[in-house]
Amino acid sequence: KLAIHLAKKLNGEIINADSMQVYKEFRILSSRPSNSEIKKAKHHLYGLISVKKYFSAGDWLKEVKKKIKLSLKNKKLPIIVGGTGLYFNTITKGISKIPDIDSRTRAKVRNLFNKLGYQKFYEKLLILDPKIKNKILPSDSQRTQRAYEVKLKTKKSLLDWIANTKSDFLDYDIKKI
């Protein structure tokens, strides 16, 4: 509601930064704006992709950059809203240039995770990449699997990629509310 109010008052457009609301299938689960709210102000990056497709923070950054540029070109103020800190950080601090991981490797890691469960998978990850200890919780299935697939494919710790390769942040005057 605040975003809609700001969009009307400041001649703006709303751009989604919630990692669940980008998915078509999560309309109800993610409190996506209603049709009546969407009519009140232009909304972008809601229901963008199917959950069946891989969509990373880097993918979101590419999309949001296009939408911000388009909004500014149309003399509109981009108003970025949502709940994913990682997405906001990609805009303000940049994102690590981690090489793409092929779908076969991702599937292999997911299958291993499903077979072993949280704790045993985490223990296996620590053998593969000891640097991860105390940096990623065993219960964080998304990050543990990402760390595993990155180490498996690149032979380099996810933490090394994160520490050494930040780029692509947006150099705009950003106000946070």
Model-based region annotation:
Residues 1-177:
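Phosphate/pyrophosphate-binding catalytic cores of soluble transferases and nucleic-acid-acting enzymes
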